[in-house]
A protein has these predicted regions:
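Short, electropositive alpha-helical surface patch
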Residues: 89-103, 242, 270-280
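Active-site metal-binding loops of divalent metal-dependent hydrolases
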Residues: 37, 84, 192, 260-261
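Short, small-residue-enriched loops and turns at beta-alpha junctions
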Residues: 86-87, 113-116, 140-144, 194-197, ...
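Mid-to-C-terminal alpha-helical segments outside catalytic/metal-binding sites
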Residues: 3-18, 30-35, 60-78, 245, ...
Length: 314
């Protein structure tokens, strides 16, 4: 073998080895923005309105450092915190907590539309860029026909904030009414698949079909894992039909990930909650999985790039 042949064969071998390494290299893990966590501290002087003392699972301090431990090495780079208190002052409590916790990339607060102080409170909290919207319960959303309620909801839209709706299957029709009233408002429906899904998903399909056609309505898939007669069902295949239906109805651009921690602890460890949906999206292409785990939430909430989430997608 001549020196030229040797150099050529060595170079070819190096190229082949590099290609082999590239082909077999494990792809980088998908970054995750968890769009549904609750943080609170029952030990503070004023206590908390929720959870109750009788809740042995949830009545304990739950803060960002605790969430980080539960996430382990799942590559959760940030979270959108969702209100867990009816107290107006707790909106500021979470915003203050976020100042020293860059893992919080957004906060969905709580104010009751129709109250005289709503507008002033909304402006005050919305001055903080981490305040990304409000969560509205079914008891408030069904009052959408009241002029004061409708006017307050329009204020949310005018500030380019979003609204989460909460209430299971009963919230679908009021959410549809809200979307018709304010078609430019970004709406996130919490906690699919609802508990009612297990009994009769077909009953919800007409409303879901209509909501799925509305471009600013997102489905938060954050209530997947179940227990039946106390036994945990952790086989991802069990949940595939529901996930397939939701992704079919809302499309790949309008489904978002939520872990619902620490409420999820009532059912399963956080790693299990994540694994069930991760298994489903592993069967899709990477672009679709990225949309679910972080890209779509950026469109829905317009969360703030900070901390580990500062360079996501760059």
């Amino acid at each position: 073998m001549t020196r030229r042949d040797f150099l050529y064969s060595s170079a070819a071998a190096s190229v082949l080895a590099a290609r082999t390494r590239a082909a077999t290299a494990k792809p980088a893990p998908i970054p995750i923005i968890d769009t549904h966590t609750h943080f609170y501290d029952p030990t503070r002087a004023q206590g908390v309105p929720w959870p109750p003392r009788t809740d042995e699972v949830l009545y304990r301090t739950r803060l960002p450092q605790d969430f980080k431990i539960h996430c382990g090495d799942l590559n959760v780079v940030g979270t959108v915190v969702v209100e867990a208190s009816e107290w107006v002052g707790d909106n500021q409590w979470i915003l203050d907590l976020a100042k020293t916790n860059p893992a919080i990339v957004g906060f969905v607060g709580h104010l009751v539309p129709g109250k005289p102080e709503f507008a002033d409170n909304l402006r005050r909290f919305a001055a903080d860029p981490l305040f990304r919207g409000l969560r509205i319960r079914s008891s408030d959303l069904v009052r959408i026909a009241e002029p004061a309620v409708a006017a307050d909801l329009k204020r949310v839209a005018d500030l380019d904030l979003s609204i989460d709706t909460l209430g299971g299957a009963a919230i679908l029709e009021p959410t549809l009414q809200l979307s018709r009233l304010l078609p430019g408002l970004r709406i996130v429906i919490d906690h699919f698949p609802f508990s009612e899904w297990d009994a009769n998903p077909a009953a919800m399909r007409p409303a879901l079909l209509e909501l799925g056609r509305r471009p600013n309505v997102f489905a938060k898939i954050s209530n997947v894992v179940r227990r039946v007669k106390g036994a945990l069902i952790d086989d991802p295949a069990h949940y595939r039909p529901a996930l397939e239906t939701l992704c079919e109805l809302f499309g790949p651009d309008r489904v978002v990930y939520g872990g619902n921690w620490p409420v999820s602890d009532r059912v399963a460890p956080y790693a299990t909650v994540h694994r069930v949906v991760a298994d489903y999206f592993a069967s899709k292409d990477r672009a679709t999985a990225e949309k679910y785990f972080w890209r779509n939430s950026a469109a829905a909430y317009r969360w703030v790039r900070r901390g580990a989430a500062a360079t996501v997608g760059q």
